Amino acid sequence: MLQVYNTLTRNKETFKPLKEGEVSIYACGPTVYNMPHIGNYRTFLLADTVVRTLQYLGYKVKLVMNITDIDDKTIRDSKAAGMSLKDFTDKYSAEFFKGLDMLNIKRASAYPRATENVDGMIELAQKLIEKGLAYEKGGSVYYRISGFPDYGKLSKLDFDSIRIGASVDVDEYDKDNPRDFALLKASAPEEIERSIYYESPWGKIRPGWHIECSVMAMNSFGPTLDVHIGGVDLIFPHHENEIAQSEGATGIPFVRHWIHGEHLIVEGEKMSKSKGNVFTLPEIVEMYGGEVVRFMFLSVHYRKKLDYSETFAENAKNNYLKLKETLDNLEFALKNVEDEPGPGDLETLKTLPELENRFREALEDDFNTPKAITVFRELSRTANVYLETGKNMQVLEEIHALYKRFSDTLGIFAKAGGEEVPGEVVRLVEEREEARKIKDWKTSDAIREKIKSLGYIVQDTKEGPKIKKSEES
């Protein structure tokens, strides 16, 4: 039974969606004003991990991830770049999607944009004013946090010293010292000049950051959703404010399960431009490959800080390559096996369900991917032991099927077994075999090097030559 740590209660809870067998998930997506760094993608990968796990457990899942394409940062940086807000945010939205593909992150069911949902934000602000939970001031609309007694229930911060009635326009304000926050902001003259405004009962406005997610989540799922995902940095003020807005308007719980991923740090320190330790995803992928980066993220539980370093990344790469080599060996054996029964067949078949039970139990324990990877490595060892002597087609097929279930659930080896070896490489391997038969080792070695230059390597096995793509290519 799936147990999920709920930030709201600070406890692991038995997961129960509103509708049996179906799960609604809203995840905070990118603010598209620059290249997302690797910490952002750790959170996006968390959403993908939750989706894949739930699907593995038999749930039908709908994930919605927003794109914040209008806020303080996008307006500021688009102006600095000399671009329209739309052209600027479209550019970085495209970069965001490229990053998802690099990490083999499944597409969400929808990616609503803030600019496409402003009418709903104006309606929500009107409703909150009618309930006495919001007020207009200077053409902006603010949330009155003193009117919502449950304010602070998610972040568990001490709000005894809240300054009642003080209001701020910034999207990100001082931690531990909240103010009435802006739902809708009066557009500044320079924003109006750039056509960054929407007509409202209070004049020309543009949305604040927090109201965007409340509206997009409720537009997608109604007043209550099963799961809301984001980074720990969003607990306060962003998610606290989402609760205040949504529950203030509807009077019913907004989210059943809050899931928050921890920070990614670099060699023990928080990423910052001043320290020069901010890495974008393309930079890291260029060094290690997308699947290795994904595997690296999965090797640390989402509620623990991930301390990125070159040593840590290299260790993840080595473990990933060992698992991939086993898959390559399995697929090679399936194509070349003689299909003979052996003494280890029954014992191996008996082991597989036990391993799958442990894999499932790991993921049911609050999406414990490091523990699931440990079980995956045990399956790899089991497979390699069998491959030394076993030749039973049924056993090999069952090992391979379980291996693929594990890898698909973790989202790795997406391209394994699907790439055709170029005809030129196949021809060179055949020529090399002819040279080896007559013990012409010089020619054999020369052909091996030529094959390597084409991005492939040859492994000589007792079943014959095995071709695989070089990890360096």
Swiss-Prot record:
<dbReference type="GO" id="GO:0005737">
    <property type="term" value="C:cytoplasm"/>
</dbReference>
<dbReference type="InterPro" id="IPR032678">
    <property type="entry name" value="tRNA-synt_1_cat_dom"/>
</dbReference>
<dbReference type="InterPro" id="IPR024909">
    <property type="entry name" value="Cys-tRNA/MSH_ligase"/>
</dbReference>
<feature type="binding site">
    <location>
        <position position="213"/>
    </location>
    <ligand>
        <name>Zn(2+)</name>
    </ligand>
</feature>
<keyword id="KW-0067">ATP-binding</keyword>
<dbReference type="Pfam" id="PF23493">
    <property type="entry name" value="CysS_C"/>
</dbReference>
<dbReference type="InterPro" id="IPR015273">
    <property type="entry name" value="Cys-tRNA-synt_Ia_DALR"/>
</dbReference>
<dbReference type="GO" id="GO:0008270">
    <property type="term" value="F:zinc ion binding"/>
</dbReference>
<keyword id="KW-0547">Nucleotide-binding</keyword>
<feature type="short sequence motif" description="'KMSKS' region">
    <location>
        <begin position="270"/>
        <end position="274"/>
    </location>
</feature>
<feature type="binding site">
    <location>
        <position position="242"/>
    </location>
    <ligand>
        <name>Zn(2+)</name>
    </ligand>
</feature>
<protein>
    <recommendedName>
        <fullName>Cysteine--tRNA ligase</fullName>
        <ecNumber>6.1.1.16</ecNumber>
    </recommendedName>
</protein>
<keyword id="KW-0648">Protein biosynthesis</keyword>
<feature type="binding site">
    <location>
        <position position="273"/>
    </location>
    <ligand>
        <name>ATP</name>
    </ligand>
</feature>
<dbReference type="GO" id="GO:0006423">
    <property type="term" value="P:cysteinyl-tRNA aminoacylation"/>
</dbReference>
<feature type="short sequence motif" description="'HIGH' region">
    <location>
        <begin position="30"/>
        <end position="40"/>
    </location>
</feature>
<keyword id="KW-0436">Ligase</keyword>
<dbReference type="InterPro" id="IPR014729">
    <property type="entry name" value="Rossmann-like_a/b/a_fold"/>
</dbReference>
<keyword id="KW-0963">Cytoplasm</keyword>
<dbReference type="GO" id="GO:0004817">
    <property type="term" value="F:cysteine-tRNA ligase activity"/>
</dbReference>
<dbReference type="InterPro" id="IPR056411">
    <property type="entry name" value="CysS_C"/>
</dbReference>
<feature type="binding site">
    <location>
        <position position="238"/>
    </location>
    <ligand>
        <name>Zn(2+)</name>
    </ligand>
</feature>
<dbReference type="InterPro" id="IPR015803">
    <property type="entry name" value="Cys-tRNA-ligase"/>
</dbReference>
<dbReference type="Pfam" id="PF09190">
    <property type="entry name" value="DALR_2"/>
</dbReference>
<dbReference type="GO" id="GO:0005524">
    <property type="term" value="F:ATP binding"/>
</dbReference>
<keyword id="KW-0479">Metal-binding</keyword>
<dbReference type="InterPro" id="IPR009080">
    <property type="entry name" value="tRNAsynth_Ia_anticodon-bd"/>
</dbReference>
<keyword id="KW-0862">Zinc</keyword>
<keyword id="KW-0030">Aminoacyl-tRNA synthetase</keyword>
<dbReference type="Pfam" id="PF01406">
    <property type="entry name" value="tRNA-synt_1e"/>
</dbReference>
<comment type="similarity">
    <text>Belongs to the class-I aminoacyl-tRNA synthetase family.</text>
</comment>
<feature type="binding site">
    <location>
        <position position="28"/>
    </location>
    <ligand>
        <name>Zn(2+)</name>
    </ligand>
</feature>
